[in-house]
Amino acid sequence: MINKLKPKSDFSKNIVTLMTGSAIAQAIPILISPILTRIYTPEEFGIFALYMAFISIGASIVTAKYETAILLPKKEENAKYLVYISSIFALFFSLLFFIVYMLFSDKFNNFFKVENDVFYFVPFGIFLFAIYAILLQWANRKKEYKNMNKNRLIQSSSISIFQVLTGILNKISFGLIVSDVMGRVIAVLLILNRVLQQVKLENFSLKKTISLIKRYKKFPKYEMPATVLNITSYELVYIIIPIYFSSVTAGLYFLVFRVLMTPIGFIGSAITEVFKNRAIEDLNKYNSCRRIYKKIFLLLFSIGIFPLLIVTIWGQSIFSFIFGEEWKEAGLYAQILAPLALFRLISSPLSYLFIIKEKLELDLLIQFIFFIFIVISLIIGCFYKDIYLLVSLLSLSGCIFYLIQIIISFRLSNGN
């Protein structure tokens, strides 16, 4: 399958380019994880997981998802306006979150049993996360895949280096969080100047800005809530587990996603960047992108099946050996979540057809149903105080959700 995707075309070259860079970038946090698990405790990982949950959910809200539309306009000027629109939204709502936290910080910290004001970093993390997504969308439109790779690599390595150094040289309970913010700042600054030069507007028109906000209103109306539901479906776990179980349990669960889902996320994201461009081109030209859909499906399945099968069989032994006996429990979670990881890997690029075909209402409905499944799983797991039952239900819900996405996106790949 991989031989069929050797660089015989721009599409194949782009996939190889992005996958190579993504493979290196995702390898860095995984490679340093055995070091971090011996520097930071599961509880500290749990607090970091809570921080990441808030910035992931927040970043999906603050741009109103207008950055997702940057690829779509045929006119370059309209895409430039969308960069400004999504950036203004991101700045405004990030500042709003900061003000709200300043007003209620004590209540917030007490509720989540956090001693230090570590969540002052959350609004900054949200803004950096959102701006970075906007900049990458523009770079993707310009097909600057090598620059995207370079930037991802710098962000990943910067965060990882800071996390190790902070833990060794100046052991603070929120070292993971501070390091994450610093790494994101570096990544944004490196790409920001080039993008600002490319998106300069000779005459800024408020009328046109409002017109484009209305033109792409489906994105805040449907894509934003769908994305929020999808992200919350996973990140809600890190918010609920510390309350009903412990921060230690949240930290163990977080390590599984760091090790298991990070490479899947990077590989899926890399292929998505190229697939969505090729899918748009094929749909415009042939009114169908089923051929490339099938090729990507088989490629992703072949990439994921064997590593995840190994995790399913020997998860506990692998985790205890690599990360230390203290993290053996995380290996059991990994065994349960491995099937979900495979479905997620396959679905993540292919489900972008919901956006390309502007079937955002349908996507929102599916995301809402999935969110309900997750909430029910959390209620049952927390009611019985059984973390294994909870993880099993979360895995099953995710498998069903991604299977539905795959089936529907396959149908969408064939024109109308």
Show where each model-derived region lies.
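Membrane-water interface segments that mark the loop-to-transmembrane alpha-helix transition
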Residues: D10-Q26, L50-Y51, S56, S60-S105, ...
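Signature of the first transmembrane helix
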Residues: S9-A64, F89, F98-M102, G125, ...
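Hydrophobic alpha-helical transmembrane segments
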Residues: A49, N116-P123, N149-V199, F257, ...
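Interfacial segments at transmembrane-helix termini and the short loops linking adjacent helices
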Residues: P42-G46, S105-V122, I313-L342
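Helix-loop junctions and terminal segments of transmembrane helices
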Residues: A59-N78, R141, V256, L260-K285, ...
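Membrane-interface junctions at transmembrane-helix termini in multi-pass inner-membrane proteins
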Residues: K8, S12, A69-N78, L128-I154, ...
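Transmembrane helical elements of multi-pass membrane transporters/channels
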Residues: N14-P29, I154-Q155, I159, G175-L196, ...
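Interhelical loop/hinge segments that connect adjacent transmembrane helices in multipass membrane
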Residues: M1-P7, F111, K146, K150-N151, ...
